[in-house]
């Protein structure tokens, strides 16, 4: 059981939460990115640099994730693939994707893509709030607690 991070788009404040959790719970955290990511020295934290390109990091995460692993990502198609493989997916705002919610999220994403393609401005997500950070930390702790149960 380990945590994979879609690190190119993951906010630094969320990475910091993950770094602390990795050491506190002795859980392996791997940040996958197409650029160099600075991480604190720890035997529980590592980086995996992939080549640049569309979905290269996502594809590497899907290739390596195993049932029971957790993936941190805001990428809904990646989260869907992780869930399909028996993993768990959590976004940086603390929303845990489930088999039931991921289908709805994929449909909404496709709808918004269609709207943007037709020229309608849809705007982006709001800035990460303190509440979002707390929600993320809470959901991460829940997952870690469940994963460590014998």
From Swiss-Prot:
PANTHER family: UPF0178 PROTEIN YAII (PTHR35146:SF1). Belongs to the UPF0178 family. NCBIfam families: PRK00124.1 (NF001095). This is UPF0178 protein PC1_0756. InterPro entries: UPF0178 (IPR003791).
């Amino acid at each position: 059981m380990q945590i994979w991070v879609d690190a190119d788009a993951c906010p630094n404040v969320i990475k910091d939460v993950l770094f602390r959790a990795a050491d506190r719970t002795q859980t392996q955290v791997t940040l996958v990115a197409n650029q160099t990511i600075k991480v604190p020295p720890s035997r529980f934290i590592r980086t995996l640099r992939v080549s640049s390109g569309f979905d290269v990091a996502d594809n590497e995460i899907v290739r390596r994730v195993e049932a029971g692993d957790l993936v941190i990502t805001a990428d809904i198609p990646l989260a869907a693939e992780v869930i399909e493989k028996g993993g768990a997916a959590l976004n940086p705002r603390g929303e845990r994707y489930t088999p039931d919610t991921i289908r709805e999220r994929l449909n909404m994403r496709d709808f918004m893509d269609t709207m943007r393609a037709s020229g309608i401005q849809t705007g982006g997500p709001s800035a990460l709030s303190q509440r979002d950070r707390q929600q993320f930390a809470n959901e991460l702790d829940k997952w870690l607690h469940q994963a460590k149960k014998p």
